[in-house]
Amino acid sequence: FVFTGGHGGGSFAFSQAIPAINQGLKPNTISTDLHTGSMNRGMKDLLNVMSKFLNIGLNLSEVVTATTWDAAKVIKRNDLGNLSVGSVADLTILNLRTGQFGFVDTKDKKIKGDKKLECELTIKDGQIVYDLNGISNKFWNE
């Protein structure tokens, strides 16, 4: 049984998600339906979707597991979503920011949250492909 927290252009509403999570019905996968209509509205990107779930009742471990390992198992790709011998060398280092953030659903309704995930570094097939703050680089005077 798969209960997904898939968020696209029309399939995610706080009015349904928050009561469901409050009653113990948590998604076992978190994903997006990425297209210009969804990324330019409330969905934005996968980290924004993950951040929404952090702010409506899931803990960090639940959010990361549902987005990575549990999602990979659903599509029968045990080589993805984990760090083990023989798995694909894809890795993302995330920052958990705290502050005041706003999140919008597909019905143009919003919530305020105090947690937001931000990508610090991405490694794809063993190669650094994104480095927000240059953490993989040496300082100029080294």
Region spans (language model):
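Catalytic metal-binding/acid-base residues of hydrolase active sites
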Residues: H7-G8, H35
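Short, low-complexity, polar/charged sequence segments that are solvent-exposed and flexible
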Residues: I21-G24, N48-K52, K110-K115, F139-E142
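A conserved active-site cap/scaffold subdomain adjacent to cofactor or substrate pockets
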Residues: F1-G6
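His/Asp/Glu-enriched, well-ordered alpha-helical/loop segment
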Residues: A13-L96
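C-terminal cap of metal-dependent C-N hydrolases
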Residues: V88-N141
